[in-house]
Amino acid sequence: MQIKQENDGHAIIDHLTGEEVLTCAINIGEQLLMSGAEISRVEDTIRRICAAYDIRQSHIFSIASCIIVTLETKDHKWITQTRRILSYGTDMWKLDRLNNLSRLICSTKPPLERINREYALILNGPVYPPVVQCLIYAMTADAFAIFFGGNLLDGFSAMFVGALIRITLYAFTAIKMKPIFSNILCSMISGMVCILTHYIGLGHHVEMIMIGNIMLLIPGVLMTNSFRDFISGDMISGLLHFSEAIITAICIAAGFIFSKILLGGIL
């Protein structure tokens, strides 16, 4: 092992074992996948990190819910790690930082201590506070309601319901409700509130209020990722993402249909 001095005078190891390279690469790949990266990018990033540290062979298999990596080290030893991905979404800030970290690793081959430090900073990165997220949901719902033909009063009602959707999703996440049920219940609750706001005179066009809030829940990024996976040749991941997007859309539609059935009589 080679030892070198950092700027602060502390000695650090400038050599990574095969196990350390594997853990480093799969950690970054896992966070990329959880942040919304396409499968081809995840596999390519892991492969490049392994190549940077002179791994003889790397075999990576990744789908939306799992990553399996097997490496052959310089001493002809084979090692494998598997990661189960339980949840994922879209985090562009984290994607950008992870991509920068992977480029840094490939270009400079930093020591493990620095990699872990940069990785920890990314994991503990800034998150929008709940109030800001509610405000973003409200403004987005308002914009879509007006865009699709509603008036200012419809937009105001959509803002209220949009903030309520964010609060409802927070509550469902806190109790770890399964996505299929949270999508149905969130859609049904927001649909009922849309109908009630129209009933008490806070909106003129209930359809526009509903559309503005449906757009908050539509899995557009997930559908786009599925086609991106198809184009990259990752058919299994593409089918998984496509199926999830379709099922999510069906759940959203079912929730709003239930709200119309329950409160449709007051329209």
Task: State the predicted function of each range.
Residues 88-136:
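Hydrophobic alpha-helical segments and helix pairs
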Residues 1-108:
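Soluble N-terminal domains of membrane-associated systems
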Residues 118-122, 165-176, 224-236:
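C-terminal ends of transmembrane helices
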Residues 126-202:
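Core alpha-helical transmembrane segments of integral membrane proteins
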Residues 198-267:
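Generic detector of multi-pass transmembrane helix bundles and their immediately adjacent loops
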